[in-house]
Amino acid sequence: MSEYLKALFELKELRQKFIFTLLMFVIYRLGSHIPIPGINPEALRDFLKAFEGSVFALYDIFSGGNLGRLTVFALGVMPYISASIMMQLLTVAIPSLQRLAKEEGDYGRYKINEYTKYLTLFVATVQSLGIAFWIRGQVSPKGIPVVENPGISFILITVLTLVAGTMFLVWIADRITEKGIGNGASLIIFAGIVANFPNAVIQFYEKVKTGDIGPLTLLLIIALIIAIIVGIVYVQEAERRIPIQYPGRQVGRQLYAGRKTYLPIKINPAGVIPIIFAQALLLIPSTLLNFVQNPFIKVIADMFQPGAIFYNFLYVTFIVFFTYFYTAVLINPVELAENLHKAGAFIPGVRPGQDTVKYLERIINRLIFFGALFLSVIALIPILISVWFNIPFYFGGTTALIVVGVALDTFRQIETYLIQKKYKSYVRR
């Protein structure tokens, strides 16, 4: 940590990246206080108290509290996350997109990114329409309308405002990725979660103060939070090292001995992405179903609330699926085996070619299984604890995993930058 702080002060380029990222965060937080035109803030606040502890509250966490205040950034970057999921699935399913992503290089990546933005626009429009039609007819418990003039003009302005806010956030995310430190979309979600920490701590303290959370439960929560953070750091940093052997070679009269190294594969290569993807998918039906005022639909909507058996089952299923899916996107055993063969390297005790592919597949599948199991436990246990002990849902494994995971990924990128900087200075000498 001290090395990173020292580098921020000493290296001008890294300092500029850090300042640029902070500036983007400031713009994001300023926009988080600009409400949608036509909303009565007090009536909205009273109305949304009924949704505390629901999936709506979880979405509000990911949006940095913007959804609960219905600001211009109410949708956050979740439409972009949802569009990215759809695009990756389409890339696997449609051969032309698959060729574009794998064979066209920078141009292919540019086009895939462009299609993702168009899809984001569509998803954001649908979600903003849903919010506009839902909120315009709502009233607070005191009978005060949430929307002062719920006409067609309110719907149009709300849709335009929310879509523009989401696309602006996507632009900010791209700028952070390009000119700042870390992954822009992940950092925006990270910033939103961290911004809500003070309110969550205050709410938690109030429950302790009033006796809603007893001493034993408090100790259990603290122990759980520490265990989750330690477990996340351990699994995110742990890796399986596959031994690699390079044969000896002769150059002229000089004989070079073979050397040994290793191929590092993360225990959880997918990181926090499966959790974010699973949440993004579950939030869509949960949000849409809550918009419909119908007794039968309400029963179905309750099945999609955190803590419900059906919700937990789908949550774990999506986490496992996206862990396998995203790891398959990141790590291709066939390509790894081909690259080893081209470099003249081999795995001791394993024949090159198909045997190497099968060996790598076996190891990767074991790692994926452990990673999926870990993510499921981290995501599910805090939800169950929050339901059993009536603890604020904010202190969940999902938020902890995202915060710790994004922080580790960002520090890793800084470390990579420092290594590249040292290597360049060494080459110049």
Curated annotation (Swiss-Prot):
What membrane topology is given? Multi-pass membrane protein
Q: What UniProt keywords apply to this chain's record, in alphabetical order?
A: Cell inner membrane, Cell membrane, Membrane, Protein transport, Translocation, Transmembrane, Transmembrane helix, Transport
Q: Please provide one cellular component term from the Gene Ontology annotations of this protein.
A: cell envelope Sec protein transport complex
Pfam families associated with the record: SecY
Q: Which GO terms describe its molecular function?
A: protein transmembrane transporter activity; signal sequence binding
- State its location(s): Cell inner membrane
What intramembrane ranges does the Swiss-Prot or TrEMBL entry report? Answer: 65-72, 73-77, 78-98
Where does the UniProt entry say this protein principally localizes? Answer: membrane
InterPro entries for the chain: SecY (IPR026593), SecY/SEC61-alpha (IPR002208), SecY_CS (IPR030659), SecY_dom_sf (IPR023201)
Q: Which domain of life is it from?
A: Bacteria
* Residue intervals passing through the bilayer: 14-40, 65-98, 112-132, 155-178, 182-200, 215-235, 268-286, 308-329, 361-385, 394-414
**Positions in the Periplasmic compartment:** 41-64, 133-154, 201-214, 287-307, 386-393
One example of a Gene Ontology biological process annotation: SRP-dependent cotranslational protein targeting to membrane, translocation
Chain ranges on the Cytoplasmic side, renumbered to this chain: 1-13, 99-111, 179-181, 236-267, 330-360, 415-429
Q: What is this protein for, i.e. what is its function?
A: The central subunit of the protein translocation channel SecYEG. Consists of two halves formed by TMs 1-5 and 6-10. These two domains form a lateral gate at the front which open onto the bilayer between TMs 2 and 7, and are clamped together by SecE at the back. The channel is closed by both a pore ring composed of hydrophobic SecY resides and a short helix (helix 2A) on the extracellular side of the membrane which forms a plug. The plug probably moves laterally to allow the channel to open. The ring and the pore may move independently.
Binding partners and assembly: Component of the Sec protein translocase complex. Heterotrimer consisting of SecY, SecE and SecG subunits. The heterotrimers can form oligomers, although 1 heterotrimer is thought to be able to translocate proteins. Interacts with the ribosome. Interacts with SecDF, and other proteins may be involved. Interacts with SecA.
- PANTHER family (UniProt xref): SECY/SEC61-ALPHA FAMILY MEMBER
Report the sequence similarity comment from the record. Belongs to the SecY/SEC61-alpha family.
**How is this protein named in the record?**
Protein translocase subunit SecY
What organism does the record attribute this protein to? Aquifex aeolicus (strain VF5)
Q: What is this organism's lineage?
A: Bacteria, Pseudomonadati, Aquificota, Aquificia, Aquificales
Gene assigned in the entry: secY
